[in-house]
Amino acid sequence: KIEPYLAGLLAAIPRLLDALTDPIMGYISDNTRTRWGRRRPYIFIGSIVSGVSFIAMWQVYPENSQTFNFTYFLLTSMVFYLGLTIFSTPYVAMGYEMSSDFHERTRLMAVAQWIGQWAWVIVPWFWVIIYDPEIFATPDQGARTLSIWVGLFCLCLAIVPAIFCKTQPVDPDHMLKLTRINFGENLRKFVRGFVDTFKCKPFLKLCIATFFVFNAFNTVAGFSFFIIVYYMNAGDAAVAGTWPAWFGSISALCTTFL
């Protein structure tokens, strides 16, 4: 058990870190020069960091103190989101760079998004598995065990594009030198580019729309389980049964086919 305000901090702080590191990671990846390209090394490293830290993140025990569990989960989740940033930012960029044709690129990203949406159809049923006494003695044991299998499975899938996907060559004259000597100049160019980006009104409108859409989605996804179990069924997960899973799956299916 943990105080509600601490649970809120556990959800907010790693996300705040994620928001700050995403544009920085994009800038670093854009200007990286390696024999394997500028995307694949980060995808490889990020998949391992995020997969291992996801497993570690859920290895908490109710016997530990609230302070220990809060600190442990916060630190491991920050490492997880950092690894996710290292993986996802170059991964998305590599997807857009796989084709120079606008329509083909749109189809590629649409298929990738459609496939990824199926994860949200499956994931809600993890609640049912975790709370099933015939599978796990306690829900916390279920979370610890299931996280190992999920983390390893996702790690194996995430590392595939780093090994098998080829990236388009980039003119080195269009890239900056990421060295400590050029740190000040690179920082100024990063900030200048960040400001110039937000001067584009169509892009700014898209950012605002995305902000509200993702906030609405994450709010419903994050609280639906607790509303169904603790408000509608007085905190009894056994009585709630498979309703939380059905709610999540049907919602995800609607967005998948829309």
Where are the regions that the model predicts?
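Membrane-embedded alpha-helical bundles of multi-pass transporters/translocases
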Residues: 1-258
